[in-house]
């Protein structure tokens, strides 16, 4: 891993929250090499709130290309094509912000964890350990094998070895357990090492139960990702969660950071995709417009969330095909843009993991028989749908559920709409995750697209990671299997770039950054030949 300079973060009172997509942090009168992650001039209570904000910035700002690939957004005709992205011919220079941001952020959490451990501040240490696990999950899901065991060692090991993705996942499960235990055991007073946790914990305000629920939900996400990997015993792991006893994030329990965002220190998603601190429209707001397949799918289902994910342009709620040349595509003002449900205000909290996603994860675990008591998979699914509506400000989901009764992309008991079409169950859960996580947590949607094998959903191919665009069936189609006029076809739709070849399809991973090949040469070379179609360990398609 290339050794870089880290600028440590400070609380919002003196924190300059920037709009940069690599979540660099404000200056704290030091600019030290990350080989010194325990510098005496910073303290764990100072670093924690800035680190949590930085995690929110990662979730907010790093996923534009995947928003496009998953058919939510597309480039407007106002801009020239991004040929590398729109033909899927990504390079070692593509998307490096995810790698850099996650490792930078984890150096901060390492500072918190190590210094808090020395001080006996178990609450702070526990939070840092859970959040490090969150970021390593992101890294594995994007890159596969990554430095883990030898990472964050500073000058003791400037060229860390890579760990197997499965081994990292197994370690993360135990790391989260340790974090939960530390938090639950922590004694908080106004004078001891855990003081001010209610203020410095900008996600849950020092609420032990919510941190335990978040940790358990994060563990469930890991288990769902690796559902087909037998080495991880799902029954055992669910048993550990049940024994801990806090459960998962529930109704209204969104994991989101709020350090005090406001006009001059805005929410990172709003500041990147809507307007800057002066209130001026950002370039990203002009660039990213509605994808026509995605927006039409919401419309086909009569989904009120359409007007929350998108805001009408001068042409109404219309989109543009991904990869369409500028000479053909509509200019940005004509097309629908990023809507008020995800870009609420500059003062809104930034979501890390929503209650809607928590219920979708629980629904899949119930569907697979891992969770054996409590609400049914259908009830958990419908609760997740309502939580999505609530988060987006879309009101009640009751009318939407009634309108789409028996349709398998909405109704867990839905029936096939044509010969060979999908039925309810897992298809419904995954379809609803696609509907709900638009610009909320796009990585999870890309992960679902990659992880589910063809045999999982009735007789119809739901996910296809092959490079054959003619069989690129992915999510639900709202009835198009019957050939209904106006119904959206299967998707996400492949790019329509005229420069694409028949060998090009949506990548199943990012490539390691070029800096790894430059500075950690032997270890990255040990991973073999990596292409955009080299699979993450849980991708068994």
Feature-to-residue mapping (PLM):
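Active-site/pore-lining binding-face segments in mid-to-C-terminal subdomains
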Residues: 381-478
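Structured, solvent-exposed acidic/aromatic patches
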Residues: 41-45, 77-131, 135-396, 415-426, ...
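Surface-exposed intrinsically disordered loops and tails
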Residues: 189-197, 276-286, 397-420, 465-499
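Hydrophobic helical h-region of N-terminal Sec-dependent signal peptides
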Residues: 11-17
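Beta-strand acidic-aromatic groove motif in beta-rich domains, primarily in extracellular
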Residues: 60-69, 144-146, 234-235, 442-444
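Membrane-proximal, proline-rich intrinsically disordered regions
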Residues: 23-72, 100, 115-118, 469-473, ...
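Bacterial N-terminal signal peptides that target proteins for export
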Residues: 2-10
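C-terminal motif of bacterial Sec signal peptides marking the signal peptidase cleavage site
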Residues: 18-22
């Amino acid at each position: 891993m290339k050794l870089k300079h880290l600028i440590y973060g400070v609380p919002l009172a003196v924190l300059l929250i920037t709009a940069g997509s690599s979540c660099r942090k404000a200056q704290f009168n030091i600019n030290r090499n990350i080989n010194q992650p325990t510098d005496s001039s910073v303290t764990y209570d100072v670093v924690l709130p800035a680190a949590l904000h930085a995690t929110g910035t990662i979730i907010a700002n790093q996923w534009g290309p995947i928003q496009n690939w998953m058919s939510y957004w597309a480039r407007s005709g106002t801009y020239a094509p991004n040929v590398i992205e729109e033909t899927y011919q990504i390079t070692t220079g593509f998307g490096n912000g995810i790698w850099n941001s996650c490792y930078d952020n984890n150096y901060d959490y390492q500072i918190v964890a190590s210094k808090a451990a020395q001080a006996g501040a178990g609450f702070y240490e526990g939070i840092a350990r859970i959040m490090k696990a969150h970021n390593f999950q992101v890294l594995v899901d994007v890159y596969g094998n990554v430095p883990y065991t030898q990472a964050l060692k500073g000058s003791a090991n400037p060229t860390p070895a890579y760990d197997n993705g499965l081994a990292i996942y197994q370690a993360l499960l135990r790391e989260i357990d340790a974090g939960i235990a530390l938090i639950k055991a922590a004694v908080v007073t106004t004078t001891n090492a855990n003081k001010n946790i209610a203020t410095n914990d900008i996600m849950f305000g020092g609420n032990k139960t919510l941190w335990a629920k978040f940790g358990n939900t994060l563990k469930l996400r890991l288990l769902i990702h690796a559902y087909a990997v037998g080495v991880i015993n799902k029954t055992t792991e669910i048993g550990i969660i049940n024994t801990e006893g806090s459960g998962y994030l529930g109704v209204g329990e969104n994991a989101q950071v709020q350090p005090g965002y406001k006009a001059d220190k805005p929410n990172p998603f709003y500041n990147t995709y809507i307007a800057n601190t002066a209130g001026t429209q950002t370039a990203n707001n002009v660039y990213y417009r509605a994808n026509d397949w995605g927006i039409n799918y919401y419309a086909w289902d009569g989904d009120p969330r359409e007007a929350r994910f998108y805001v009408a342009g001068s042409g109404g709620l219309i989109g543009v095909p991904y990869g369409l040349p500028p000479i053909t595509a509509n200019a940005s003002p004509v097309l629908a843009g990023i809507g008020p449900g995800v870009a609420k205000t500059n003062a809104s909290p930034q979501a890390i993991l929503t209650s809607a996603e928590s219920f979708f994860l629980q629904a899949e675990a119930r569907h697979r028989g891992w969770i054996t008591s409590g609400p049914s998979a259908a009830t958990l699914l419908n609760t997740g749908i309502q939580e999505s509506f609530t988060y987006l400000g879309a009101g009640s989901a009751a009318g939407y559920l009634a309108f789409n009764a028996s349709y398998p992309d909405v109704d867990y008991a839905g029936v096939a709409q044509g010969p060979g079409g999908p039925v309810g169950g897992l298809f419904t859960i995954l379809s609803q995750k696609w509907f709900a996580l638009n610009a909320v947590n796009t990585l999870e949607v890309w992960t679902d697209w990659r992880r589910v094998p063809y045999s999982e959903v009735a007789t119809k191919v739901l996910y296809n990671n092959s490079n054959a665009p003619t069989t690129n069936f992915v999510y639900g189609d709202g009835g198009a299997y019957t050939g209904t006029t106006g119904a959206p076809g299967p998707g996400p739709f492949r790019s329509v770039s005229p420069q694409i070849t028949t060998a090009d399809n949506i990548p199943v991973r990012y490539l390691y950054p070029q800096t790894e090949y430059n500075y950690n040469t032997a270890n990255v070379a040990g991973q073999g030949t990596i292409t955009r179609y080299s699979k993450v360990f849980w991708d068994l398609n």
